[in-house]
């Protein structure tokens, strides 16, 4: 896509994200998004074949951005404890923000009808986080800073320990 088309696509994704977050997936129409955009449904369909495809693109974009932000400013060669503490604080604070929680609720509600939305969420969010954290763990194991272990299991256990029940309580509003 030319740069102008890239900018237009990004604008569509930003506006669609806002509308989906306010109204949820089921209550959002392409007409409502087009109205907020100041364009036509035809413009939306030039970029996305369906509301589901548009929502999938919103989910992928939001998750990729969130996953990347979790690894900003991680001390590259610092003490393992320092890096894990930093990551734990960031993941806990970012995943408990209202936006990510709201997005997860929408995804959970729609995944049964549209499994590709759940897959897009998993691949661009949780899987990316798992892969990057596993890479950190593998490097620490190789450098002798962490006991021999399966880095994927260690990463999953660490993430789950950090989030514990707090994430579930926030997600379910209790």
Place the predicted regions along the sequence by residue.
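Short, structured helix-loop boundary elements
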Residues: 9-10, 30, 52, 56, ...
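Amphipathic alpha-helical packing segments from all-alpha helical-bundle domains
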Residues: 93, 102, 106-108, 116-142, ...
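Short amphipathic alpha-helical interaction/hinge segments
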Residues: 62, 66-70, 99, 115, ...
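Short loop-to-helix capping motifs
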Residues: 50, 113-115
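Hydrophobic/aromatic-rich alpha-helical bundle segments in the mid-to-C-terminal region
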Residues: 119, 141-174
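Key DNA-contact positions within bacterial/archaeal DNA-binding proteins
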Residues: 42
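Amphipathic alpha-helical linker/stalk segments
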Residues: 56-87, 93-95, 99, 103, ...
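Basic, helix-initiating cap at the start of DNA-binding domains
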Residues: 1-39, 47-53
